[in-house]
């Protein structure tokens, strides 16, 4: 085919429109004019539009630091593709589920690919010979990063004009607080799984942080989004209530044995 028939292709994988407004807006801008598209320019314009010019650059940096707080559990395979692999929240959910179901029998490599996985190892993409140690190290690094960005979001919130605060909370601040708490929770869950000593203490901390993560996530339910996470318990979703129930049972079981 001649040049006139050549087309640019963009592949986007987003769970839903509401949680990825900025990312999908960036893709739309890219597809409008791919040769002229510049990520920094787009993000600055986006932040000016939705958070005001006075704080646009500050919010830009928060977005960048938020994305770089995610644990990069595997090095990129494609040259020039930064952070190709990150440990997103549904991978956290799989860790809670799989280890929780085999909690009594420790294994340094307890995680298996999901049933429908077509590429071996793709479900988790964890490098190293010891999954549990890699996760503990990764969570310890990542929750510190999320904590710092979440604190900066909290400090910026009252300085934003009232008209910008709702979207800032829903699109950046709440997700960051959610991931911070989730990372703390998984860290303590893994600690309780690997080490018998103070197991109940760490299960209690895992519960405390997972409850906080749920609170942060559900804080974005308002207005037309009041029932946004009502389907969280469906197959393939995180299902925080089920994970909390699992943690309560483990805590109660091991709490009795440690008394």
Give names to the regions the model predicted.
Residues 57, 61, 137, 141, ...:
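Polar/charged alpha-helical tracts
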Residues 166-170, 185-188:
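Long, leucine/valine-rich, helix-dominated scaffolding and oligomerization segments
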Residues 146-160, 185-192:
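Non-transmembrane amphipathic alpha-helical segments
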Residues 2-5, 193-258:
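Short, small-residue-biased leader/transition segments that mark boundaries at the very start
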Residues 1-152, 156:
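Structured mid-domain segments that build the active-site/substrate or prosthetic-cofactor binding neighborhood
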Residues 175-198:
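Extended, well-ordered alpha-helical segments in internal regulatory regions
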């Amino acid at each position: 085919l001649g040049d006139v028939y050549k087309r640019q292709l963009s592949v986007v994988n987003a769970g839903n429109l509401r949680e990825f407004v900025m990312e999908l807006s960036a893709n739309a801008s890219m597809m409008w004019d791919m040769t002229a598209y510049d990520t920094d320019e787009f993000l600055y314009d986006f932040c000016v539009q939705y958070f005001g010019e006075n704080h646009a650059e500050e919010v830009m940096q928060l977005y960048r630091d938020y994305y770089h707080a995610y644990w990069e559990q595997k090095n990129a395979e494609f040259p020039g593709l930064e952070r190709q692999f990150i440990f997103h929240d549904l991978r956290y959910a799989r860790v809670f589920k799989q280890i929780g179901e085999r909690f009594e029998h420790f294994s340094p490599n307890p995680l298996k690919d999901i049933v429908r996985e077509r590429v071996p190892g793709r479900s988790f993409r964890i490098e190293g010979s010891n999954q549990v140690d890699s996760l503990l190290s990764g969570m310890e690094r990542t929750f510190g990063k999320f904590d710092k960005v979440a604190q900066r979001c909290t400090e910026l919130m009252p300085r934003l004009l009232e008209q910008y605060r709702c979207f800032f909370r829903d699109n950046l601040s709440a997700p960051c607080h959610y991931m911070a708490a989730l990372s703390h929770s998984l860290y303590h869950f893994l600690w309780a799984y690997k080490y018998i000593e103070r197991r109940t203490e760490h299960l209690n901390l895992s519960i405390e942080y997972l409850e906080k993560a749920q609170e942060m996530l559900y804080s974005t339910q308002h207005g037309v989004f009041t029932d946004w996470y009502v389907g969280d318990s469906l197959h393939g979703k995180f299902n925080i209530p089920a994970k909390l129930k699992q943690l309560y049972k483990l805590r109660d079981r091991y709490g009795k044995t440690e008394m």
